[in-house]
C-alpha cells in the first residue's frame, strides 16, 4: 500500500490529458526529440500491443513495421517527452497483450477494426 503523500505527489504530476485507448488501437505518438541544441517532434505511429496501468508509472508499447523490420517502442504515459497521443483507429481484439503479433507478418498481422 502506497503512502498518502506519495499518492498526492503522483496525482499532481498526472495532469496530462490522455485519450482512452486499448491494445489493438492504432495510435500516433508525438515524441519530443532533442538533436544538439534543437528540439523537434517526431511521430511514431503503430499498434498498441501492451498497456500497463500503474498510476504515474503507466506505460504502453507501440509496434510498427518500418521498411520490413518490426520496431517496438515503450512509452511512459505521463512522460514529459510524450507531447501528444491520438487514436487513429480502434482495433477489435480479445487479448490484453498482443505479443503474438511479433511472430506474424503481412496480412496475418492485421487487426480487425472495431465497429461502433
From Swiss-Prot:
Source superkingdom: Bacteria
Gene3D superfamilies per UniProt: 2.30.30.790
Keywords: Ribonucleoprotein, Ribosomal protein
Gene Ontology MF, one: structural constituent of ribosome
A single BP term in Gene Ontology: translation
InterPro entries (alphabetical): Ribosomal_bL19, Ribosomal_bL19_CS, Ribosomal_bL19_sf, Translation_prot_SH3-like_sf
Pfam families listed in its UniProt record: Ribosomal_L19
A GO-annotated cellular component: cytosolic large ribosomal subunit
SUPFAM superfamilies linked to this entry: Translation proteins SH3-like domain
UniProt xrefs under PROSITE patterns: RIBOSOMAL_L19 (PS01015)
Family: Belongs to the bacterial ribosomal protein bL19 family.
PANTHER family recorded: LARGE RIBOSOMAL SUBUNIT PROTEIN BL19M, RIBOSOMAL PROTEIN L19
Role played: This protein is located at the 30S-50S ribosomal subunit interface and may play a role in the structure and function of the aminoacyl-tRNA binding site.
Identification of the protein by name: Large ribosomal subunit protein bL19
Source lineage: Bacteria, Pseudomonadati, Pseudomonadota, Gammaproteobacteria, Pseudomonadales
Gene that this sequence comes from: rplS
